[in-house]
Amino acid sequence: MADLQERGHLLTEQVNPLSQNLDQLSSLELVELFNSEDLKTVEAVAAAKVQIATAIEQTADRLRQGGRLFYVGAGTSGRLGVLDAAECPPTFCTPPELVQGIIAGGAGALVRSSEDLEDRAEDGDAAIAQRHITQLDVVVGITAGGTTPFVQGAINSARQRGALTIFIACVPAEQVSFTADIDIRLLTGPEILAGSTRLKAGTVTKLTLNILSTGVMVKLGKVYGNRMVDVAVTNQKLRDRALRILQDLTGLSREAAGFLLERSSKWVKLALVMHWTGLDKDAGDRLLSAHQGNLREAVASYKNQND
């Protein structure tokens, strides 16, 4: 573990030479500087694309076997993990326990700074034990500077339980080395405001989690083409989206699409199976279940057997 008392050598703590006159910039100059620095976040994701792709494949494999995905972090990193986890149920109709966020300090830390709680590795260990992590699960540790004891404690505990571990940090391994199954380094350089990792480090983390969770859900068959066919229809906006998906993919009128959606218990994926195969709700559900919810595979299998 790195020396927690001295972090000045860390990339995320260094002073950015391009922003040394930050307090003297005009508002327009400040925006231009932020815009140019933020371009580095996209470059950092590109540089880590192989590791991110590996994380997608291996995470999807664990979840197919009944595993769960956990994000672990403190401060901004923890909040981003909780945010990404919270978006999965409405977007992909996943149960809330499938993707979970663990933040040092618990729910209260989402709205009130609790950074002092990140220094306890034993709390990270306890968080993993409390959730009964097994070899089927995936634990993603997120720590911009790479040294957060809460995250390191959680990852070490998860490794001991046989879980797939993924480490995400914004410092090079030469500065902070850590043992995990997949090591993702997102190097965006010093922050415009020195040490404020809610900036580029936060942005690049959000980009990466977007790709990771969406990629996993694509691999799990939660998407057809680029449509969220497992969207949870829980309000008027999402009902409208569901109807437009059905209209676009079937050519039905809005009224007919609405009727089909109701017949399928508001499940777009099942509605499409029913429309494309002529099966009733129960038979369509069984067909999807036989193909682990993969719409494309289910429909192709039915057509191959009935041509």
Swiss-Prot record:
Recorded catalytic activity of this chain's protein: N-acetyl-D-muramate 6-phosphate + H2O = N-acetyl-D-glucosamine 6-phosphate + (R)-lactate
Domain of life: Bacteria
Residues of the SIS domain: 59-222
GO BP terms in the entry: amino sugar catabolic process; N-acetylmuramic acid catabolic process; peptidoglycan turnover
Pathway given in the UniProt record: Amino-sugar metabolism; N-acetylmuramate degradation
Subunit composition and interactions: Homodimer.
Additional detail: A lyase-type mechanism (elimination/hydration) is suggested for the cleavage of the lactyl ether bond of MurNAc 6-phosphate, with the formation of an alpha,beta-unsaturated aldehyde intermediate with (E)-stereochemistry, followed by the syn addition of water to give product.
The protein, known as: N-acetylmuramic acid 6-phosphate etherase
Lineage per the UniProt record: Bacteria, Bacillati, Cyanobacteriota, Cyanophyceae, Nostocales
